[in-house]
Amino acid sequence: MAGAQTNDDTFWLGADISGTTELEARDWKLYNSKGEIRENTALMKEIGLNAVRLRVWVNPIDGFCNMNDVLEMAKRARYYDMKLMIDFHYSDWWADPGKQTIPATWQYYKYDEMKYALAQHTRQTLQLLKDNKIDVEWVQVGNETTNGFLWPMGRAQDNMAQYAGLTEAGYEAVKEVYPNATVIVHLDGGCDLRRYEFIFDGLKQHGARWDMIGMSVYPYWDNDAGLTKSYQETISKVVENIHYLNKKYNCELMIVETGAEAKKPQQGKTIMKELINAAMTKCGGHCKGVFYWAPEAEGAYPLGAFQNHRPTAIMEAFTEAK
């Protein structure tokens, strides 16, 4: 069952800036709109954001986004008085609806051993943060777990009971360290109601708990996949789904990932302004925030919000949000 709804009316404007230390290691400089050099967290604060999202990988080859690296970035968020979301991938690298690879050191575990490993990794990471006086507001148990995680053991379509058991193990581990943290289960495709009912009906049926539903909302990918025909349709469906899911599962929601085309900054600003406005004013107070994913990203990834190492008009949508 979902957790009780809260009365906190703060709206969170955030960004996933998990790549910060890796960019610094590559000597990648960032600048504000005036051309002044800025550290990434400081730049997000300057833009007007009040929250940061950081992913955790179990044993990444290069060390970026392991628990110690996340601690370094979390200290910066604390310095700038920004609320913190921790996003556990439960993988050594990217986890998303198309891949949920078991960490190399966990790959031969049986189900009970996997639950223990997941819980222990969750506890150890969060305890490290807590020991360093870091407050954690939200914790994601899995990243875009539309098809479950820790495949094949926790693939939701084949093993819903095991996916639910693993999710519950994560939930309990979070609450052991941060009893007041909000635990999020996060899916992609916020415009597609069916995938949300499939996962959350399954979790509920098998006794797993969560406090908040996290959504990815990317009009660019929705249009590309044929889920919607326009960004307006994506936003409209997301608003409808937030109302429906809030009522059905008695929990609040948050858009924990979004993005727009970096090469079309004015269009991107329009999309983000409309999405943020809809989240703030059309969801009955049940959407608690919007987080842009990797705004500083440039190059192969098409949905960053920077050009020439500085923010484009897309980020003005966050600065101007009221």
Feature-to-residue mapping (PLM):
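N-terminal substrate-binding region of glycoside hydrolase catalytic domains
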Residues: 7-78, 82-83, 91-118, 124, ...
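Mature, Sec-exported extracytoplasmic domains of Gram-positive
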Residues: 10-12, 18-22, 55, 114, ...
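Aromatic-rich peripheral "rim/lid" segments of glycoside hydrolase catalytic domains that contact
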Residues: 25-29, 94, 230, 244-250, ...
